[in-house]
Curated annotation (Swiss-Prot):
This is H/ACA ribonucleoprotein complex subunit DKC1. Residues 1-26, 391-410, 419-506 are annotated as: Disordered. It is found in: Nucleus, Nucleolus; Nucleus, Cajal body. SMART domains: DKCLD, PUA. Catalytic subunit of H/ACA small nucleolar ribonucleoprotein (H/ACA snoRNP) complex, which catalyzes pseudouridylation of rRNA. This involves the isomerization of uridine such that the ribose is subsequently attached to C5, instead of the normal N1. Pseudouridine ('psi') residues may serve to stabilize the conformation of rRNAs. Required for ribosome biogenesis and telomere maintenance. It comes from the Eukaryota. Residues 421-434 have a biased composition (Basic and acidic residues). Keywords: Isomerase, Nucleus, Ribonucleoprotein, Ribosome biogenesis, RNA-binding, rRNA processing. Disruption phenotype: Dkc1-deficient larvae have smaller eyes and head compared to wild-type animals, opaque lenses, defective development of the jaw cartilage, bloated fourth ventricle, pericardial edema, and hypoplastic pronephros. Inner-ear development is impaired. Reduced pseudouridylation of 18S rRNA is detected in Dkc1-null larvae at 4 dpf. One of its GO terms (cellular component) is Cajal body. Residues 291-366 form the PUA domain. It catalyses: uridine in 5S rRNA = pseudouridine in 5S rRNA. Belongs to the pseudouridine synthase TruB family.
Amino acid sequence: MADTESKKEKKRKSKKISDEEVGDIQESGDFLIKPESKVASLDTSQWPLLLKNFDKLNIRTAHYTPLPHGSNPLKRGIHDYVRSGFINLDKPANPSSHEVVAWIKRILRVEKTGHSGTLDPKVTGCLIVCVERATRLVKSQQSAGKEYVGIVRLHNALENEHQLARALECLTGALFQRPPLIAAVKRQLRVRTIYESKLIEYDPERRLGIFWVSCEAGTYIRTLCVHLGLLLGVGGQMQELRRVRSGVLGEKDNLVTMHDVLDAQWQFDHNKDETYLRRVIFPLEKLLISHKRIVMKDSAVNAICYGAKIMLPGVLRYEDGIEVNQDIVVITTKGEAICTAVALMTTAVISTCDHGVVAKIKRVIMERDTYPRKWGLGPKASQKKMMIQKGLLDKHGKPNNSTPSDWKEGYVDYSTTKVKKGGEASAKRKRDESGSEGEAAAAAQDTSKTEEESKKEKKKKKKEKKQKLAEEAAAEAPAEEETEVTESAKKKKKKKKAKETEADSD
């Protein structure tokens, strides 16, 4: 008892601080948020793929229920890992890109493969080969920028090396290009942008120049070399070419050969060792590292996979610098890519709003039902389920005889309501304005009469057409008969002559 009384007295004393004392404390104390040298306990600078620097994202809410479904991209089972990955392949010279991709498909025993943009048979270098689920990102990779290192052969000698460097600088920006004579596409004029180019080395004796180019997807380096020769006035052609970067990945980012892929699959088949296969194939999330990120709650993931709108209440975190119509990636809390999307809100709008559509889905990447279905669990949906169980609604959730009038008036079924066309709505408005039912009936009769008249006219026209065709056929018939008679007479004469000749020979 004594302890409880002493505690109560302490509480009273703590509460009984006069306003004067509070004023003294506020005057004497230094109140400011001081800078701290302590590093945050959570350092995500070394986290993998899309979770890198996760702690630097803006927090909208930290409250969500984690679900045990899904997994970190690097810790997927080997079957899922292979079927949702890509290979940064060093394409060999001579086989075409399609041949190489077909060989990889056969080696890995998968159903679907795709690549990040064709390379000519003689060209080597980076070719991103996407496997199964990663083929959904092929289009975005094909339109990504590329970098090449090429060798140009000039037909005549130059005065100095600077001429070639100057000509390369001239050929930057938007250029007109027509595909080479031997090309798999229609040879029509097109505009392609060259972002940057520089001369690496020039050999005046052999008249060979090595250059580096960063350009838009679909640029013909062979055509660029021809233009370079024309600009210098000596003529030129491409001798050799290698792609050193395709989109996000370059030749220093774990480039593998065809032999590496074959050995990795052999190692897995015979020794059940999947480490080599995991070093050759990378998760598809690595292709999306350059995109801005939005993190969704686990309960919203499957709805997005089924095509639901990306709404603000489902957002956990979002990145700085998101602009409207910018391509972004929507991810889970485990770092898996759900879909690529086009942003409909900026970062500032996301931070100030509490409702609305954040982004429009561009391409869903994740398979459906990887996470459980969590829609239809709201108050209205739960009430509807209860009413179906009690028999107040039919099995499809539609009203029946025993449905209460409050439900019929208040509930809006969005699956059945359709947007009415402007013409129908305007006609109805006119009828409402005119008011009388008699006028509406008269209008209906008039329309029915006009429809009947139009039908009769159509029938008449059809009859007239038939008669004309019959007359034309009758006129042509006798002429055809005459020609047939003359042809038959000629045939008979020929037969007679043939018989006579046979008789003479006998």
